[in-house]
Amino acid sequence: MDTEYYQPSDFSIGHRGACMQFPEHTLESYAAAAVQGAGIIECDVTFTADTELVCRHAQCDLHTTTNVVVTELNAKCSTPFVEGSGVAPVCCTSDFTLAEIKTLCAKMDSSGSINGTAEEYVYGGTADWRTDLYQFECPRVPTHKESIELIGSKGAKFTPELKTPSVEMPFNGVYTQEDYAQQMIDEYIEAGVDPSQVWPQSFLHDDVFYWIANTDFGDQAVALDDNYTSTADGFIPLFDRLVENGVKIVAPPMQRLVEYDETAELLMVESEYAKEAKARGLDIITWTLERTGPGLSGFYWESTADLDKVEGDKFNLLHVLAFDVGILGIFSDWPATVTFFANCFDVKLVGDAKTCLTDAEIAALPNTVAVDALTSQNHVSLGPRPFWLVDEMRDNAIKTTLGTSMLVIS
């Protein structure tokens, strides 16, 4: 299948790596995101009992993202798993030292019944459109520093999110929120990473204001928006406060940026939220494509609930976001989908690979194209999913353009 004829794109952001199929926030997941052409890759940052920084989506998710409850460390969890109790466990990074966390195996973010055994709880519940295939070799929980090393080695850029603490701050009475925010930035400084390569994020906007006021990493700091109202009364005051404090980028979930319009060619149009943000000079990043199972319903698709959607509508959404809204980039659980789109429409590509070949150029390709994408920074392997999604599209000009890039090499 396709390899060197696609290139990475900074429009394509690896959400927790490539966590549709790889255990989130593992080096394996980050490597998979790089192979799929994510130009920017995310580490969600939280801290351990000894205030070391590790990559986890939440401070208290170890019970669903690792095997901790089947180990002796279960006893140290904030709420240990007790078989037969019917009580859900809660295991936090701050319950353990870094050395202890490094003994755990990461896994797909899921859980079975709390009424079963510890093994059934740990290894149950993975959605059937995901997979457990890549979790049984015991991938480890990476430190933030390890994520910087791995992501940088793949030629990708960085978007760390400082996770909101689940414990009282200052932690242990001494480790303040500002200490935490500064420590994350310091690890990029120590690694020699230029600020232009980093988009630090937080839902706590005081963190973003801190980076702007106190570090060289504030110019691309991202204010995540979890105020999901679609009314102007909800988002205009937010935009004004961000601008007043020097913020340049806001990041809402993707459904806030589009609305259903049965008269539009792609059946989606730019939302008032997007228009108002841009009117105030804010750039936009959004999240998260490929987070939803078959059917395209629920949270991420609620603003187009009246549209009878097909799987291929993901590409129509991407086109509206890229060319009508004008977003900087989009997080995806499977970056290959976004990378494929970005190559076809020349969106924020990185490198010199040739893309969207003509029929004549495709016919001239060699029968075999072999690239070790895992060890090469600039070669991309997308796999079959983007091509399947094209097949699932409605007939329109977007499908025609994407179809010219379906390189299946025998």
Give the ranges of each region predicted by the language model.
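Low-complexity intrinsically disordered segments
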Residues: D395-T401
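Phosphate-group recognition and catalysis centered on beta-loop-alpha active-site segments
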Residues: M1-D395, M406
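N-terminal signal peptide
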Residues: T404-S410
